[in-house]
Amino acid sequence: MGLPWYRVHTVVLNDPGRLLSVHIMHTALVAGWAGSMALYELAVFDPSDPVLDPMWRQGMFVIPFMTRLGITNSWGGWNITGGTITNPGLWSYEGVAAAHIVFSGLCFLAAIWHWVYWDLEIFCDERTGKPSLDLPKIFGIHLFLSGVACFGFGAFHVTGLYGPGIWVSDPYGLTGKVQPVNPAWGVEGFDPFVPGGIASHHIAAGTLGILAGLFHLSVRPPQRLYKGLRMGNIETVLSSSIAAVFFAAFVVAGTMWYGSATTPIELFGPTRYQWDQGYFQQEIYRRVSAGLAENQSLSEAWAKIPEKLAFYDYIGNNPAKGGLFRAGSMDNGDGIAVGWLGHPVFRNKEGRELFVRRMPTFFETFPVVLVDGDGIVRADVPFRRAESKYSVEQVGVTVEFYGGELNGVSYSDPATVKKYARRAQLGEIFELDRATLKSDGVFRSSPRGWFTFGHASFALLFFFGHIWHGSRTLFRDVFAGIDPDLDAQVEFGAFQKLGDPTTKRQAV
């Protein structure tokens, strides 16, 4: 036929059998990728330290999605929370991967069958004997079936009525586990961080989809609307389908980047806004203050801070710190976290406590500045010693650690104090192993960043695809170059060939 690469899809334009075939093949490719990617990730994933080396630090992409839907066990005998198990059951990580690969193979065979046996009786219009599809009816069927699936997911899987529930955690990502969720039917259901909204919204949306599907199955569109929206043209279906996909992609890019109950930080890592707002730092200080109020010593109060909470309060876990084109996991950047050194408290020779000003998200370098409780600069690491007034040496800054591996250790040597002041710019201080993976010390983004970038980019691309194909189907007569003053009107939705003498003509 000699079609250019950007026109090859015209071969399925008037061929419902092969149109179905290529869509089944697409499903085979998607499911096959998902299953294969899951097996690859399971081959390289290290489940031994869920606190300091969780899935998102290791760059896992599909494991978090399986986990949030209730999969926590592996046939390898480990659990995602760090425990060991003896009976993982069929629906383990490997079981889900295998199911996707088997499904992919079946779809592959079905696609071949439908490509070979394309001229089926079901696709023929008995009035004309030509291939045709009742698109409004097909729309109703798909809407009804997707409504059933949506309702079933919300009413059974999420609620635990028939299924495991979903991943639910506290606001600071410390106690996450898979559990059933009750639907939230009040105003709280509209809070994106309330898991109950996931159940109630799926039940409500599924019910609406079922009713809308039944409506479109039982009510035919008016003729003027049918013609006005080109409902007989398959490119109309393509355009509106692309619209649904790009809208969904924009929505999930937002819920991933800004955070929600559907994107727990234990599975995808913290958001950049939690660093920007000092979210974890405030909670840590609140817990320490509560400990001091109970007559604990500073050392005891800091020792009770969970290592997991301290690790979230580290800039290396901020997804906005990794460049878009820095390939690899977070562990390939700053290294594998081994342990929390503790919280450094800086003091000048007068005994005044000083706080290191933290590095903002979009800075690669930042001056080391130490301020007191009132925000007044008391010490720094100067760029030019000759003009220095507040250098660590001049002010006599010391550092003492509370909690962590260096609990109770203090340093007064200026070089050591400056080293820890620089590291305190990046949040809580951790020992990082860069040797194992030959990590280069340059921050990487988390799967939260990759997912957002990918979905926002494709959503924009698909938005233009929607405009393109929508314009083609709505203004097809204009693009085909038909004289607007033509006395007879060609019905393009039903007849493809221009200039065909057998094409029916209808007076305007």
From Swiss-Prot:
Cell compartment(s), UniProt: Plastid, Chloroplast thylakoid membrane
Pfam families listed in its UniProt record: PSII
Protein's GO biological process: photosynthetic electron transport in photosystem II
Keyword Magnesium included in the entry's annotation: no
Topological category with respect to the lipid bilayer: Multi-pass membrane protein
Keywords on record: Chlorophyll, Chloroplast, Chromophore, Membrane, Photosynthesis, Photosystem II, Plastid, Thylakoid, Transmembrane, Transmembrane helix
InterPro entries the record matches: PS_antenna-like, PS_II_antenna-like_sf, PSII_PsbB
Cofactor: record remark: Binds multiple chlorophylls. PSII binds additional chlorophylls, carotenoids and specific lipids.
Superkingdom of source: Eukaryota
GO cellular component: chloroplast thylakoid membrane; photosystem II
GO molecular function: chlorophyll binding; electron transporter, transferring electrons within the cyclic electron transport pathway of photosynthesis activity
Chain ranges passing through the membrane: 21-36, 101-115, 140-156, 203-218, 237-252, 457-472
Subunit structure: PSII is composed of 1 copy each of membrane proteins PsbA, PsbB, PsbC, PsbD, PsbE, PsbF, PsbH, PsbI, PsbJ, PsbK, PsbL, PsbM, PsbT, PsbX, PsbY, PsbZ, Psb30/Ycf12, at least 3 peripheral proteins of the oxygen-evolving complex and a large number of cofactors. It forms dimeric complexes.
Family: Belongs to the PsbB/PsbC family. PsbB subfamily.
Role summary: One of the components of the core complex of photosystem II (PSII). It binds chlorophyll and helps catalyze the primary light-induced photochemical processes of PSII. PSII is a light-driven water:plastoquinone oxidoreductase, using light energy to abstract electrons from H(2)O, generating O(2) and a proton gradient subsequently used for ATP formation.
Protein name: Photosystem II CP47 reaction center protein
